[in-house]
């Protein structure tokens, strides 16, 4: 008798567990659905890798996309041209100030406009900044060498 009641209890418990399972028809939550209202042309995203030059990449991206907005053709401007001349001017100023200012990698978006006004601008194909067999920008060694040299 005890075995039968234990068996019936176990069977009823299992049937409740089986009936408590979710059905396949349960609603699946959807993620956000975005609707394009207006699609603007943009230049492709570029990889700065490990160069500490996000300021140059973002400033150049701003200029390239603004040219597209104005109806000009797409152009790929050189980020490393800006970095080169910005670092050169920083080094000259650092020496003139007898080391009494900050000299390190990095900069600001305003540096892009400064270099553009003073030195002009060139396309990426003219000056890509990769001259030692590397396929991406890695400025850790450059930053250390330039700092010790200056």
Residue ranges and their predicted role:
Residues 1-23:
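Bacterial Sec-dependent N-terminal signal peptides
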Residues 23-150:
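Catalytic-core signature of thiol
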């Amino acid at each position: 008798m005890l075995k039968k009641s234990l068996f019936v209890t176990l069977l009823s418990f299992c049937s409740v567990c089986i009936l408590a399972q979710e059905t396949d028809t349960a609603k699946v939550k959807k993620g956000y659905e975005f609707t394009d209202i207006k699609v603007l042309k943009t230049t492709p995203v570029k990889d700065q890798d490990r160069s500490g030059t996000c300021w140059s990449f973002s400033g150049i991206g701003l200029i390239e996309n603004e040219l597209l907005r104005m109806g000009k053709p797409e152009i790929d401007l050189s980020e490393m041209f800006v970095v080169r001349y910005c670092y050169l001017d920083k080094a000259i100023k650092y020496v003139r100030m007898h080391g009494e200012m900050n000299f390190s990698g990095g900069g600001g978006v305003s540096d892009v406009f400064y270099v553009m006004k003073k030195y002009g601008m060139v396309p990426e194909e003219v000056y890509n900044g990769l001259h030692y067999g590397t396929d991406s920008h890695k400025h850790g060694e450059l930053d250390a060498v330039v700092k010790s040299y200056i």
